[in-house]
Amino acid sequence: MRVYPAAPTGHVFVVDGDPGKLTVIDPKSDSAVATIDAGSKLETAVVGGNGKLYVNREQKQEIVRVDTATNEIDAHWPIPNCSSPHGLAIDLETHRLFSSCENNLLVVVDADTGTTVATLPIGARSDAAAFDPKRKLVFSSNGDGTLSVIAEKGANSFVTLASVATKVGARTMALDPESGRLYLVAGDTTINPSADPSDFRHRYVVTPGSAKLLFLDPMP
């Protein structure tokens, strides 16, 4: 479950991932005022400055746009060649969405039209994306133990800068937009030889008590 505040209504949007629904809460009345059914599993959502909320629809490989004034879905945008879109971030200045996919791709989408403007290589099994608005950097945290770093040179121009080694399973990420510091969570892992190598979730077993907080500071 993820919770997002959305202007200008002041409502709170709760993403119920597996059921494929969003619950809209009015914090003033402390009550649910609407339920939006997207029809299948949802992943990360972001809020634009235009009263729209965007959310990855994983199994359909698309981005769904929600009008927060009416609490209705007003667009379905396919994400070409994107298997299991998980992470989603937004540049509010250029109106660009960054959707990270499990199959080594990050897809850049125009947040106004739904047009794909770029497709970039990233690490495998991405679970989160982040955008640093001060430094114009896009990040993808990947389950294969890498952090992909991409520079936004313009609305339709992007350059891959680095693949930073992290830890296997370090897929969850948060960004401090002021300092530019990135935080990731991971633990030590052992390999389960009986699990298929393609079954990432059961192949790598986290050692109890080994959780670590990793962080990456921007270049000075």
Stretch-by-stretch model annotation:
Residues 1-220:
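Predominantly soluble domains enriched in secretory-pathway, periplasmic, or organellar proteins
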